[in-house]
Amino acid sequence: MFYAIKNNYDQAVMIHGDDQYHVKYVPKLFKSLENKKFSAVTGSRMKIKKNALIGKMPIYKFIGNIFLTFMFNLVFKTDFTDCHTGLWAYRVKKLKEINFGQIDNGYNFDSQLRINFINKKLKIKEIPIQTFYRDEHSSYHIKYSINFLKELFTYR
């Protein structure tokens, strides 16, 4: 993303490195950016809820995603279906409007960037995608969830 900004690309994509997101969706993301009213496009695992379950999203993550996205929508008066996706495409011109010095370069980067987009009235579109989950044994989801809820009120 920062390489795209530095080199004045038109569009950039961000894909989490956890092998959950297939690159086959990237052309659809970029195609959606052709509509100039959108500054970013995300792949939503929850737009068609069964897609998340077909991709073997653990039930606790499924329920957690619904709850945390509900809270986000409540606070910011938005109607997203998946605030925790790891698949984004951006219009680089709009990324240049963001002060990245105020955004944490960790697990909460995506949600802080989403909040920045909303606060700047930049439009985000969601397209439905499927993902694939592998067996995982991480306790970070609890810490992430707590930090996410804190951010809703900190960056509002």
Outline where the language-model segments fall:
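DNA-recognition element of transcription regulators
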Residues: 111
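Acidic metal-phosphate-binding loop of nucleotide-sugar-dependent transferases
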Residues: 19-20
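C-terminal, non-catalytic tails of nucleotide-sugar-dependent glycosyltransferases
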Residues: 151-156
